[in-house]
């Protein structure tokens, strides 16, 4: 198979599986690691993938729009667990995330004050009359159905909330990352105004690294996911005393 054919197949694979390793490329095409690495280098030069440790992921320009992402059983389990952590009378901040948007389905009609930059969160929470919801000001982003920008940042600086429910694109041993500089900056400000940071991340977000750093693992208080992270990430979680909740219904595990 020619290099161009392999490269096309790799990109097609990534649209379904999100990440690919050098070993997987070697097995798929019966090539050496050097050949697999050259394919990824070429794809990165073309702007189609982003190389990460031991493989590659889709570049930010190829990441599926927020509006096109569909709920999965894993995300529903994570959202249900996250909603159970809300308490009566809390002031909470909700990030823009397809998983966080699902939390509205599992809220037990608690009287909480919600601040968010997500249009979908506002729409979904409208069903709860006991919930006071505030949409942050800013520039509308049609791709992610949220508001961002300097006005959003400056308004966040006026708040101190009990809980932040944070979404993410990449989780690794070195911390949390995002493909968007603007998104990373916004998330950092959200973290600064929260007493407790709860991150929601399904297993596809692990071992993915992007250009812009959001925060260190030490900035997270609770991490909710659906599968046990790899050893290096779990070690970092334990070192920083992050409460890890694994919602895999086959295991029902929780690590503190």
Pin down the residues of each PLM region:
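Amphipathic, positively biased hydrophobic alpha-helical segments used for protein targeting
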Residues: 65-66, 93, 100, 178, ...
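A generic "binding-loop/recognition-motif" signal
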Residues: 98-99, 121
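Conserved phosphate- and dinucleotide-binding cores of soluble alpha/beta proteins
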Residues: 2, 12, 19-25, 123-256
């Amino acid at each position: 198979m020619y290099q161009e054919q392999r490269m096309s197949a790799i990109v097609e694979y990534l649209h379904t599986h999100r990440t690919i390793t050098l070993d997987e490329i070697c097995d798929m095409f019966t090539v050496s690691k050097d050949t697999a690495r050259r394919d990824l280098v070429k794809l990165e030069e073309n702007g189609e993938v982003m190389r990460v440790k031991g493989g590659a992921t889709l570049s930010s320009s190829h990441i599926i729009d927020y509006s096109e992402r569909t709920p999965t059983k894993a995300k529903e389990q994570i959202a249900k667990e996250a909603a159970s952590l809300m308490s009566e009378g809390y002031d909470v901040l909700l990030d823009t995330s397809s998983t966080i948007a699902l939390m509205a389905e599992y809220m037990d009609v608690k009287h909480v004050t919600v601040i968010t930059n997500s249009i979908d969160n506002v729409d979904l929470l409208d069903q709860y009359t006991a919930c006071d919801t505030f949409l942050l000001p800013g520039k509308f982003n049609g791709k992610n159905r949220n508001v961002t920008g300097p006005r959003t940042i400056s308004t966040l600086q006026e708040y101190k909330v009990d809980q932040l429910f944070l979404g993410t694109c990449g989780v690794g041993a070195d911390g949390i990352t995002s493909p968007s500089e603007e998104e990373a900056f916004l998330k950092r400000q959200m973290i600064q105004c929260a007493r407790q940071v709860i991150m929601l991340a399904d297993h596809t977000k692990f071992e993915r690294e992007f250009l812009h750093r959001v925060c260190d693992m030490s900035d997270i208080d609770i991490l909710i996911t659906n599968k046990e992270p790899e050893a290096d990430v779990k070690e970092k979680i334990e070192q920083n005393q992050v409460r890890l909740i694994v919602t895999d219904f086959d295991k029902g595990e929780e690590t503190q």
